[in-house]
Every structure is written in C-alpha cells, then in structure tokens.
Amino acid sequence: MQNINPTQTAAWSALEQHKADNLNIPQLFAEDANRFDKYHLNFEQQILVDFSKNAINQKTLELLRQLANECGLASATEAMFSGQKINRTENRAVLHTALRNRSNTPVLVDGKDVMPEVNAVLAKMKDFCERIISGSWKGYTGKAITDVINIGIGGSDLGPYMVTEALRPYKNHLNMHFVSNVDGTHIAEVLKKVNPETTLVLVASKTFTTQETMANALTAREWLLAAVKDESAVAKHFAALSTNAKEVAKFGIDTANMFEFWDWVGGRYSLWSAIGLSIALSLGFENFEALLSGAHAMDNHFRTAPIEKNIPTTLALIGIWNSNFLGAETEALLPYDQYLHRFAAYFQQGNMESNGKFVGRDGSPVTHQTGPIVWGEPGTNGQHAFYQLIHQGTKLIPCDFIAPAQTHNPVGDHHAKLLSNFFAQTEALAFGKSKETVEAEFVAAGKNLADVAEIVPFKVFTGNKPTNSILVQKITPFTLGALIAMYEHKIFVQGVIFNIYSFDQWGVELGKQLANRILPELQNAEKISSHDSSTNGLINQFKAWR
C-alpha cells in the first residue's frame, strides 16, 4: 500500500475550502425535491442505503471521491483482495475475503493458493456440525449434545455472539452460551445452566495461550472432570478453534477436532473462519454458508462497483466528511431490530481496534483525526436514553439507522410502530423544529404566546443532524453477511485514506504486559511499592479487602 498523507492532497485542501459553504440539510432538500433519488444506493434489491440526510452535495461527493483516488484506494483494494501483505507491521496478508470466496477463484499468498485449505476446513466444519446437530456425537454417558459453550474473547466472541443473536430465528435445538470475561462470574453463571453429560465446549484461541480464554477453558475442564473423573471424557466434550496442535493435545482435546485458521485472518474479521463454528452449530451449516455468500456478494460489489455506486466506499467517505471536516468525534449505530442488539458492540471493536491509531504508515504521528468512537443501542430503547443529546446536545453525532422492512415476529402492529419511529427519528434529526413551528403549535393548542415565551426556546430543535438510513428487506443469513461485509469495507476504506495500518492492534498489548507483571504480586499479602503511588495504593487496598 502506498504511503500518502491525506492532508497533503489537493482534494483535502479543496474539502477544507468547501466546508465554508456550510451546507444545511433542510436547505438541500428544499432546493431539490428529488434529492433521495440522487443520494441512495441499492444492493441486490435487498439493502437500501439512503445517505440523502447528510450535509453533502454533488461537489462534496466529487471531492471525497477525488480524495479516495489521490490516496490510492483502488490499488489498496486490489492489494488486499490479491493477498499482498498489507498488514506491514506484522508482515501478513489480510484475507478474510478469501474465507467467504464462494467463487473459488484462486487467492495466492506467497505464491500458494489458500482456497484448498479454506475449503478443507469448511468441509471439516460441516461434517462436525452434522454429527453434533443430528445427535450422532455422544458425550461420555452416551447422551447427545444439547448445549454448546463458546469460550473466546474479542473477535473469538463478539462476532459469533452477535451473529447467533442476530439470526436467532434460524436457530436449531442446540442451546448456545458464550463466555468471554476472565471474571469468574461469567463462566460460573453459564456452568450453572448446563449438564456436563450433554455439553460441548469450543475453545477459541489461535495460540491456545490467550490468558482469559485459557483460564475459562481450564475452569470448564475442571468442572467436567469433577463430574466424570475420567480424563478421556475431555475429548468427547471439547473442541478447539486453534493452530497450536501441541497445546490442544496437551489439554486433552483430540486434534481431529481442532479447526484451524491462518495468520492472515485478523481476530475481528474471523467469524467467517473456524471461529464461526458456534454460528454453524447454532444455525446449521447451510445457514452459515448463506452468511458467507452474502458477504461474498458484498465483496464483489465493493471490488467491482464504480466509486459513484460503491456502497461501502460512499459510507466511508461521508464518515470522513463528518469527522474530519465537520468535527464529529463519534458515530452511533442504531439498529431498529432487537435481534441486532450486539451489532454496535461488534463494530465498536471492528472500527475502533482497526482505525484507533495515531501513527501513519510512514511511522510518524498523524495530524488528522483517525477512527471515530463507535457506540449504539437498539431502537427504540435508545430514544428513551441518549437521543436527547443527539437531538439537542452540543456534540455532532452522525448516526446509522438500520431496520428490516419485514420482521420475523409479526405481532400485532409492533413492527409498524417500530418502523414509524425509525422513519421519524431521521426526519426529526434532519429537519428539527423551528421557533416559529413551536409557537404555532402553542397557538393551535390555545395558548397565549406571552405565557409560553419562556418555554419556547427549550422546544426548538436545530436539525441539520446527519444520518444514514439502511433499510434491509429482511434480516437473513445472506443479508446479514452482506451488512457485516459492508461495514468491514467501510472501515478498510477509511484506514486507507487515514494512511494508517488497520489490521494490527498493538494497543491491546501494553495492558496485557503490565497485567502479567502485576499478577504474581497479587499472590501474597505483602505491601506493594514497585509502581506509581496510585497503582500501589489500589493494589494494597485490594489486598486489605479481599
């Protein structure tokens, strides 16, 4: 990938000047009654992306596209898809796209096609899923599996948990449980719910050394052996999503039940790999394949659609406009679908771990904003929690509103009520409510304006708050796969333009190193003085209270 400082491009300078036009969303709609027609894109007639309620015009988009071209987006995209080692700090290719490459077109890393190995792992996953789901796989007392616990953290947990929740309508009879936190409460509460005779534990750790994951896995192992008192039972109740065959075997897991993935799969992009085994077990392998197919379709769109019609690129560019030029520091993901209740948390990791960097590809600190803070909750819950600040606060918070046109649960008029809020919120954020409108409402209600003059300012909404509306025909494995891939590619595009490396996560390491240094200090009652006064004080109080 090229090393291009975006702030030194002609497009960046032009965008800085263009910002002075102070585009206003209500005014843009007033000037063009058909604005929606020009500012939305459609993916396979299943996902509609409306970006008309942003403070942009054609000039904005032209300059943003020029910025993408000047920053080498096209060549960077081909570099990723073709297996070049674009993760320079770890000298790795970035090929989550190969995991869902349903066309089987060869993808080369160091001259070797990775697709045969990808397909071999998928075939192994399919066979394993069929045995567990059908009941032919038996536990140590000869009973079929009823419960599956996925033990992982970060990408080994967030993605599988998000997808299994999002696609709950497609679930089979297996009960799924996810354990991530090293807090013993998490594993303890899950183990209370399950029977060791009928439980399968998936241990998701590439190295099989991840501290949190292995602590939980060893606790689950002790729990099983407390019930059965036979080490051979471990092989009937544990499987590994890992590449460390030696440690897997040492744990007691049959390496025939070890599902591999590769160093070109980043953790936060790994749900498409063997890390997605919990998804396949929960939904059935055919639905896991449909998830892959949806992502592959979006990959093809991203790779081949011209920039004017390219959905992930358009969303990425508008995000850069909002954050780097209009001053937004956060982005809210607001799914109007309860099944998507972990979607924002998933892309909180996806975006913030990818683009939360302050060093450019040239090794120097950047002078521009990089990745935004990403957060969100399902609608309509958020409306009764934090929308107040979005509507009337002093922070600019661009929002993505996501909703399905068809619900899996057509209960009364619930879905119409839900979607009426979905449509109303973006309209309210864009157009607000003027002082004149507030006064007219008071008059219509029979109030004397003199009596309510003090209240009027508090009921004014300034509007001009940017939103994207993403309307999905129905949340299915295919459309969810496409939606996830859409956001993945958005993150990639922004990383290219920010001139950072999006596929490492060195920020995770320092805390781990310090925790490993502190852990032995907690094993005794001695007072600690080896840290700063704050850390010493906290550790010593912990020792006094435990």
From Swiss-Prot:
Keywords: Cytoplasm, Gluconeogenesis, Glycolysis, Isomerase. It is found in: Cytoplasm. It comes from the Bacteria. It catalyses: alpha-D-glucose 6-phosphate = beta-D-fructose 6-phosphate. One of its GO terms (cellular component) is cytosol. Its EC number is 5.3.1.9. It holds the Pfam family PGI. Belongs to the GPI family. This is Glucose-6-phosphate isomerase. It comes from Actinobacillus pleuropneumoniae serotype 3 (strain JL03). The gene is pgi.
